[in-house]
Each structure stands twice: as structure tokens, then as C-alpha cells.
UniProtKB/Swiss-Prot annotation:
Organism in which the protein naturally occurs: Bifidobacterium dentium (strain ATCC 27534 / DSM 20436 / JCM 1195 / Bd1)
Matches recorded under HAMAP family: Pup_ligase
Catalytic activity: ATP + [prokaryotic ubiquitin-like protein]-L-glutamate + [protein]-L-lysine = ADP + phosphate + N(6)-([prokaryotic ubiquitin-like protein]-gamma-L-glutamyl)-[protein]-L-lysine
List of residues binding ATP: R77, T90, W453
Residues annotated for Mg(2+) binding in this entry: E34, Y79, E87
Keywords per UniProt: ATP-binding, Ligase, Magnesium, Metal-binding, Nucleotide-binding, Ubl conjugation pathway
Identification of the protein by name: Pup--protein ligase
Additional facts recorded: The reaction mechanism probably proceeds via the activation of Pup by phosphorylation of its C-terminal glutamate, which is then subject to nucleophilic attack by the substrate lysine, resulting in an isopeptide bond and the release of phosphate as a good leaving group.
Source taxon at top rank: Bacteria
GO molecular function, one term: magnesium ion binding
Pfam families hit by this protein: Pup_ligase (PF03136)
Active site: D81 (proton acceptor)
The protein's Enzyme Commission number: 6.3.1.19
Length: 488
């Protein structure tokens, strides 16, 4: 039985102002990615605890911000999560490409912290100590950590609708967004399937749901809710990161428009009888077409994840044709190109040419590499495959992924310059622009300050505070200019 969902009741029935009403009526969206990183040290003269190493990584942060929880110049959040996992949450983005740039910036931030820590570790633990920072979702000890996506959705979409209509899409999209994993049960196309135990929940630490329903919109609670997607892997592939955000956005547009018009979207018939079983089946079906799904309405869908994805894609394609204004919802991503690439990916599975996706899908790339090495050597121990798997995800000292990119084995959508720029510059069309400027100026002046997603607080040399409730609003208000003047 699926868990019952409830709103938190923290919103009123007050009428929305004109600007917010326009945002609700449009197809625009806010995107964000939260990534928990794994940490380990090899080559040291004495054992180095992962938690202590993570704390060492954050020593420069604590020295400057007096906390392991801070916001940086690009508007993103940097902090130590439960279990001493360094975590980076991207600033608000209006477009998947902006979210991708911020995500790539997070890799660079983590790499810099790791290399600084490595330099300091070698002074006391030997010159061969190496700090590894893994952008993946499972370690060799069986611990899991997450990559969570955030989507701002309209309040009028019931939580039950999200559960029944979006979850089958999220489960089956993993054929092109999965990062892949070598484990005790062989190769799986996802990293998280063995660790997710519920479909929907309001907790992420006590349980491991696929979708989290805590009502923390970080926006006007009368107008929006924040969809917190747990089911998803940490991607090295830039294409996979862009596609998971863009395709999910388009499916949400269909669901939201049906809600506006008071009708069914048609996606309810794709609900699985057992989402957990479906998730495991997808993860173990590298063909993409072999799994068989029992549906909640008693029907059976054959043809694997591809068959379900084709149904979603057909509905999205019709919707975009009928609502051309959806194209304007993403300022830097062409929705027609997204649809074309979605088609191309599914056709590769349908035709049996899965290797054609090795230059853009993480799990396909890794599996082809591992299969080639096995064929060349005759046999590689499982421990060596696991080592290569981890190296692929090591943003600090890994060589496998970087080598693939250099040789054209993995396509990139952004250059290093764009990632470098995103380390310091937030998107200019969300409130992150204001937060980023505030943080930059406060740090430059040595002022004491704090902030969160919706609030800026200046504590010295003067005290001032302001609320930034609208994530789409990047315009400098009189209040904001006054705060900047206090820092001048």
C-alpha cells in the first residue's frame, strides 16, 4: 500500500499578487541539484577517517564563515551533511543548462577543497596520501548517499498526482540517466535501486524514499511547492544531467496543465503496482526492453523501461505541439532538441544498439569500458572493476572520466571556462543573483553575515535583513540597495 500524503498546512488562502499569479500561470520553473559527496584517503602512512577528512576539507570554510554551513559567491550552498558527507546544493536556476553549469562548478569547488586537504594531510600522513572525493551514490561498504533534484511545482498539483503520475517516469528514465554500479549482484544501471525502500515519504534520513514530500517550497507557499526527487544518480555525464532535468520539466508541464484545466493528464495509467519492484527491475535490465511491469490498474506493460518512456515521450511531444509557449519556459535549452535526443536515446535501446549511447550515458560508458577491459585481459577481478568504477566518479584525483572526455569518449556540453565562471557567478535571472552579490560584497568587506534560500542578514558593521521569497525575482529592490550601501 502506498503511503498517504498530506500537505503541511502552512499556507493560507490569501489571493496571489499579480507577479506571482503570472509565474503560476506560466510554464517557467526553478531547478536545483543537491549532491552528497563521498570521501576517502588512500596511500597514507596511517588510517584517515572519512569524517575527519571531510572536516579538514571544511576547515577553510569554518575559518571564514564560522560554520560548516555556508553560501558561496555563486549563490549555492556548501555544507557538511549527515555522516560527514560534503554536500553542495546549486543555486536556483531557470534553465537546465544553468543548473548544469552550477553542478559542474560544485565539482571544482570540491576538488579545490580536496587538494588543499591533501596538501595538509601529506605533512603528517606521508607524501603519498591521496584524497578522493566521489560524486557517486554508494561506497564499497554498502553505504548510500544521494543526489537530489529540486523542481518548483504549482501548489494546485496534488501530491497524490505527483506520486502516481510522475514516479513511473522517474523510475524508467534511469535507462538514460543511471550512473551504473559494479556490485555483489553484478552490474546494475543505477546506483540507488538497492537502497530506496519507499515510493514517497516526508523523511530522507529515517527512510529512503524515491520522492520526498516535506513542504518546504522556499517560495510563496500559497503558490508553489518544492518537489524533492530522491530517485536519481549522481551523474558525471553532462548530457545526462541536462536531460534528466529537461525531460522531467516537460512531464511536469503536462501534469500542471492538466491541473489547471481540471482534467486528467493520462499519466495515471502508468502507475506501477509496486514501484520498488519496478525500480529493481529497471536497474537490472541493461537491455532497457526486457522488464515486465505489473501496473496499478491490473494491466501489464511489456517492453521494459523503454515502453513506458515511449508513452511519456509521445504525450510530451503532443503537448509541446499544442502548447508552443512551453518552448519559452527554458531560456537556454531548446525543448525540441530535448525531445529529439529523447527519441534518439530510446531508439538506441529499441534497436539494440545501446553502445551508441556510450558517449553520453554514464552506465553505458562504464559498462562498455569494463567489457572491453575484460575482453582484452581475459578476466579482471571484481575488486579491480570496483576500483575503476570509483575512479570514474572521483572529482579530485580520478583519471578515467577525464581521459574519456579528452579522447571524445564522453561528450561535454560545457567547457571548463563555463564551469570556472559558475564557481563565482550565479545565474542572472533568479534571486541567486542577489544572494551571490550580497555574499561577494560581504566577504570582500569582511562583514559578518548569514543567509539562507529566502533571507539575507547583515550582522556587522550594521544590522539589516531582507526576505527574498520569490525565486524568479532578480531585480534589486530599494531594500537590497540599502543593504549594499551599508557594505560600501
Amino acid at each position: 500500500m502506498m503511503p498517504q500524503l498530506r500537505d503541511s498546512g502552512n499556507h493560507s488562502t490569501a489571493p496571489l499578487d499579480g507577479r506571482t499569479r503570472g509565474e503560476v500561470d506560466a510554464f517557467i520553473r526553478i531547478f536545483g541539484i543537491e549532491t552528497e559527496y563521498g570521501v576517502s584517503v588512500t596511500g597514507a602512512d596511517a588510517p584517515c577517517d572519512a569524517g575527519q577528512t571531510a572536516m579538514m576539507m571544511f576547515q577553510p570554510i569554518v575559518a571564514q564563515a564560522r560554520s560548516t554551513n555556508t553560501y558561496i559567491e555563486n549563490g549555492s550552498r556548501l555544507y557538511l551533511d549527515v555522516g560527514s558527507h560534503p554536500e553542495y546544493a546549486t543555486a536556483e536556476a531557470r534553465d537546465p543548462m544553468d543548473a548544469l553549469a552550477l553542478d559542474a562548478a560544485g565539482e571544482l569547488v570540491m576538488r579545490d577543497l580536496a587538494m588543499d586537504t591533501q596538501h595538509r594531510l601529506r605533512e603528517g600522513h606521508g607524501r603519498r596520501a591521496i584524497v578522493h572525493v566521489f560524486k557517486n551514490n554508494a561506497d564499497s561498504a554498502g553505504h548510500s548517499f544521494g543526489c537530489h533534484e529540486n523542481y518548483l511545482v504549482r501548489r494546485f498539483v496534488p501530491l497524490e498526482t505527483i506520486e502516481h503520475e510522475l514516479l513511473p517516469f522517474l523510475i524508467t528514465r534511469q535507462i538514460f540517466t543511471g550512473a551504473g554500479r559494479v556490485g555483489g549482484q553484478g552490474f546494475q544501471i543505477t546506483q540507488r535501486a538497492d537502497f530506496l525502500d519507499e515510493a514517497v515519504s516526508s523523511a530522507t534520513t529515517r527512510s529512503r524514499p524515491m520522492v520526498n514530500t516535506r513542504d518546504e517550497p522556499h517560495a510563496d507557499p500559497d503558490a508553489f511547492r518544492r518537489l524533492h526527487v530522491i530517485i536519481g544518480d549522481s551523474n558525471r555525464s553532462q548530457w545526462a544531467t541536462m536531460m534528466k532535468l529537461a525531460t522531467t520539466h516537460l512531464v511536469l508541464c503536462v501534469i500542471e496543465q492538466a491541473g489547471r484545466e481540471g482534467r486528467e493528464s493520462g499519466f495515471a495509467r502508468f502507475a506501477f503496482a509496486d514501484p520498488g519492484a519496478a525500480n529493481h527491475a529497471v536497474s537490472r535490465d541493461a537491455s532497457g526492453v526486457g522488464a515486465v511491469f505489473d501496473m496499478a490498474d491490473g494491466d501489464v506493460i511489456r517492453g521494459g523501461a523503454v515502453a513506458v518512456q515511449e508513452r511519456y515521450l509521445a504525450a510530451v511531444e503532443r503537448f509541446v505541439e499544442d502548447h508552443p509557449e512551453v518552448g519559452a519556459s527554458l531560456p537556454r535549452t531548446d525543448v525540441h532538441d530535448v525531445i529529439a535526443q529523447w527519441h534518439e536515446a530510446l531508439e538506441a535501446f529499441r534497436s539494440g544498439d545501446v553502445d551508441a549511447l556510450a558517449d553520453r550515458v554514464d552506465w553505458v560508458c562504464k559498462k562498455r569500458l569494463f567489457d572491453a577491459l575484460q575482453a582484452r585481459t581475459g578476466h579482471l577481478p571484481a575488486s579491480r572493476l570496483e576500483q575503476l568504477d570509483m575512479d570514474y566518479h572521483d572529482v579530485a584525483n580520478g583519471t578515467v572520466y577525464a581521459s574519456l572526455c579528452r579522447r571524445g569518449g564522453m561528450r561535454t556540453l560545457l567547457g571548463r571556462d563555463a564551469a570556472d565562471r559558475a564557481v563565482h557567478m550565479p545565474p542572472d535571472d533568479t534571486r541567486a543573483a542577489l544572494r551571490g552579490r550580497f555574499v561577494r560584497e560581504a566577504k570582500a568587506k569582511g562583514a559578518r553575515y548569514s543567509c539562507d534560500w529566502t533571507r539575507l542578514t547583515l550582522m556587522s558593521p550594521h544590522h539589516s535583513e531582507m526576505v527574498l521569497l520569490d525565486p524568479f525575482d532578480f531585480e534589486e529592490s530599494e531594500r537590497f540597495r540599502q543593504m549594499m550601501d551599508m557594505l560600501a
